[in-house]
Amino acid sequence: MTCDKHTAQTIGKGDLVVVVGAGRSGMAAARLLHRMGARVRLLERNADGVPADFVRWAAEAGVEIATGDHAPTQFEGARAVVPSPGMAVSKLRPLLAQGPDAPEIMAEMELAWRQLDGEPVLAVTGTSGKTTTVSLCAAMLRAQGLSVFLGGNIGTPLSEYVLSVAHGGADGQGRADVLVIEISSFQLQACTTFRPRVAMLLNISENHLDYHADMAEYIDAKFRLFRCMEEGDLAIFGQGVRDLVAARDLKPRTLFFDAAARRFPRTCLLGGHNQANIEAAWQACREFGVTPEAAEKAVADFAPMEHRLEAVAERNGVLWVNDSKCTTVEALRVALQAFDRPVVLMVGGKFKGGDLASLLPLLCGRVRAVVGFGASREHFEGAWMGQGDFPMSWHPALEPAVAEAAALARPGDAVVMAPATSSFDLFANYKERGHAFRRAVEALP
């Protein structure tokens, strides 16, 4: 399989491309494909899932929209298929033709990458810390005076950058000096020629096993980020993946960042893991000419990311912290290590797997109480109930859990919502869960 985007299969005028999913990246891909002259068919299971303004645009542009369950006939004759990040490639393949007539499966990221005109890419992946790290990278680069596009899994699809270049581009100044991209294992599974100049794998822990067949597939997806990199490129890794790196034959220069460097101590970011994110960002940005002075200023001015160990209030001497983005057992471990005060811990949601019992040594002596809400009660109580020196309780909804946490907390404590689960039992996404937590805290008497 070629890594040269110029010799990879091309999409010509009139070629049929099927886009699966009407999320932001799917709609951006459809618009870009239309601009390229392709014949576009967009599939969306939810009949109400396509925004009205996009439906109007599609009607004017001649882009077909089909709702309902996907069928093999919808993919017949397709030159390529662009799946939503949430659709596993393994579930898509049975719907497609095989052999010489098989369409290419490409992520929206891959589609957009092939349309770029030489802009250097700094890409970041990892189980946790991606969004904070790419945001730190963007801040450091901008502090150096560089124009930056920040996007990918963080929110703005790369296709939107490609479409925008003719209309002012990143930072309103045409083409960006650097494209800073957050990329997930979902997106990487369908990337074939994507080549960053600098790429970073922060860490790997058990995650998304409801999507990937097993841990090996998840790890392989993460390492696809480095597949097309060359000797002049730079691959940056956390110390925790050193053995995984040693088992692979990688072409680019490699660097393992020092998570304990504490190079830029002036920051309001909580936790040692954020010091690691800062060091990783610095090592990446040095490649683009960022000076220590510019990086130091960027770190000092950097505000905590929403829903990531975000201090939302301090009431009666109690610090309230929203870590709704904490969706895994490993992320909960990191969250707990960030506090040197007693914690009232709030957990619960749709459990994605992981060894909760392994957290018991960290919970004991550190956690005053555990207050759960929503789904997964059996997982948490099965692992922790009666095993430590902290009481546990459970509530069907978030609001009564916040009220009980307030009653249990003492001055000097932190109430930390670090659910260690996805949000899909009670909320549409982790952001909605975080906002609900903030509202519940603000409503306390």
From Swiss-Prot:
Which cysteines pair up through disulfides? They are: none
**Where does the UniProt annotation locate this protein?**
Cytoplasm
Recorded hits in InterPro entries, A to Z, give:
FAD-bd, Mur-like_cat_sf, Mur_ligase_C, Mur_ligase_C_dom_sf, Mur_ligase_cen, MurD
Primary residence: cytoplasm
Gene Ontology cellular component?
A: cytoplasm
As for family, the record states:
Belongs to the MurCDEF family.
This chain's protein is named UDP-N-acetylmuramoylalanine--D-glutamate ligase
Could you tell me which species this protein originates from?
Answer: Nitratidesulfovibrio vulgaris (strain DSM 19637 / Miyazaki F)
